[in-house]
């Protein structure tokens, strides 16, 4: 998965993307409902000279959760402190972060569903009362001291909202579902990023890149950079539709945004498991991927695009998946030959 061009996760090559991120809500493209709500809540908080209520962003990776956290910090004129659930190993780690904050600061915790439960409980008074409870001493001599915390905003991000405990989830004032972007929104993101990178690109080429970006801005920016490399070498540096298509075909990202691994999953269901249903564990074992990786990384897009369906008995290939390989269910049953052997 590490070398996938269409992985939605942050990789080393994406570091340049930080310079492409918008810094205000006005610059931010997509997520219209989330953006509209945040605009109202931020303006209301600033009007009352209060910190913004705590926010939880949830949805697939690469859709702009971290970018929105940066924007909120900028709009609230506070500093952004970034950490993650797995990085906070001890109660003292979280206490140190909380006591370093000032009014209107934003604490962003990525993968918040992976917080240790004992550490999570420290957040409860911090979120509700802006207070930190510390126990000093041991045994009968132990006593609890409450420290006041500044009026900060906690922003949590998760790809697995169902794994959050109810007490933690209920303490967020705003729960924002991040959705996949439309092809048109991704085209606008590509055009904007190309301008920042000083690359000339036609809108048709930008749309082609956006269309193959799996509804994910992070992937769109990554593909843009690789298409730029191709056109710098094979063309005059400008990106036209022909150059974009040639570069993306060379990268093995097809017109639906699927790569070799996506096609491998569909091939397995159709040609090796007769279209399904097939259990997720069996499918993961067959294609050599982790179960969680399939469920969190590959499956959301394949379901969202209508290639596979979840059923109580397992995963089933849709008619669209059969059409993708140019076969019908009848042809597949008459010829149970795996594409893997071709």
Swiss-Prot record:
It catalyses: ATP + H2O = ADP + phosphate + H(+). Mg(2+) binds at residue 66. SMART domains: AAA. Keywords: ATP-binding, Cytoplasm, DNA damage, DNA recombination, DNA repair, DNA-binding, Hydrolase, Nucleotide-binding. Its EC number is 3.6.4.-. It is found in: Cytoplasm. InterPro entries: AAA+_ATPase, AAA_lid_4, DNA_helicase_Holl-junc_RuvB, P-loop_NTPase, RuvB-like_N, RuvB_C, WH-like_DNA-bd_sf, WH_DNA-bd_sf. Residues 182-252 are annotated as: Small ATPAse domain (RuvB-S). The RuvA-RuvB-RuvC complex processes Holliday junction (HJ) DNA during genetic recombination and DNA repair, while the RuvA-RuvB complex plays an important role in the rescue of blocked DNA replication forks via replication fork reversal (RFR). RuvA specifically binds to HJ cruciform DNA, conferring on it an open structure. The RuvB hexamer acts as an ATP-dependent pump, pulling dsDNA into and through the RuvAB complex. RuvB forms 2 homohexamers on either side of HJ DNA bound by 1 or 2 RuvA tetramers; 4 subunits per hexamer contact DNA at a time. Belongs to the RuvB family. Has 3 domains, the large (RuvB-L) and small ATPase (RuvB-S) domains and the C-terminal head (RuvB-H) domain. The head domain binds DNA, while the ATPase domains jointly bind ATP, ADP or are empty depending on the state of the subunit in the translocation cycle. During a single DNA translocation step the structure of each domain remains the same, but their relative positions change. This is Holliday junction branch migration complex subunit RuvB. It comes from Clostridium botulinum (strain Langeland / NCTC 10281 / Type F). The gene is ruvB.
């Amino acid at each position: 998965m590490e070398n996938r061009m269409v992985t939605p996760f942050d990789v080393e090559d994406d570091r340049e993307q930080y310079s492409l991120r918008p810094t205000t809500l006005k610059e931010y493209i997509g997520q219209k409902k989330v953006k509209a709500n945040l605009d109202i809540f931020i303006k209301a908080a600033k009007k009352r000279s209060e910190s913004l209520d705590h926010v939880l962003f949830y949805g697939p990776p690469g859709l702009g959760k971290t970018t929105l956290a940066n924007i909120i910090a900028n709009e609230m004129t506070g500093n952004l402190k970034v950490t993650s659930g797995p990085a906070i190993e001890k109660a003292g780690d979280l206490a140190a972060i909380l006591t370093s904050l000032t009014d209107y600061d934003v604490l962003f915790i990525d993968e918040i569903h992976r917080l240790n439960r004992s550490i999570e409980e420290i957040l409860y008074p911090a979120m509700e009362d802006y207070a930190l409870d510390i126990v000093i001493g041991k045994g009968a001599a132990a006593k609890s001291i409450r420290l006041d915390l500044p009026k900060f905003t906690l922003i949590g991000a998760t790809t697995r909202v169902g794994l959050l405990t109810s007490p933690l989830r209920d303490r967020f004032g705003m729960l924002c579902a991040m959705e996949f972007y439309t092809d048109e929104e991704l085209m606008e993101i590509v055009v904007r990023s190309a301008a920042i990178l000083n690359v000339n690109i036609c809108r048709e080429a930008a749309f082609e890149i956006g269309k193959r970006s799996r509804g994910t801005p992070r992937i769109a920016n990554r593909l843009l950079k690789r298409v730029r490399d191709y056109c710098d070498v094979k063309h005059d540096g400008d990106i036209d539709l022909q150059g974009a298509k040639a570069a993306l075909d060379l990268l093995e990202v097809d017109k639906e945004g699927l790569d070799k691994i996506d096609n491998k999953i569909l091939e397995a269901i159709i040609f090796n498991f007769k279209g399904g249903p097939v259990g997720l564990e069996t499918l993961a074992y067959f294609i050599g991927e982790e179960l969680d990786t399939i469920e969190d990384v590959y499956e959301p897009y394949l379901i969202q695009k209508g290639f596979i369906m979840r059923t109580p008995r397992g995963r089933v290939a849709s008619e669209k998946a059969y059409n993708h390989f140019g076969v019908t269910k009848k042809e597949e049953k008459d010829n149970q030959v795996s594409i893997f052997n071709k």
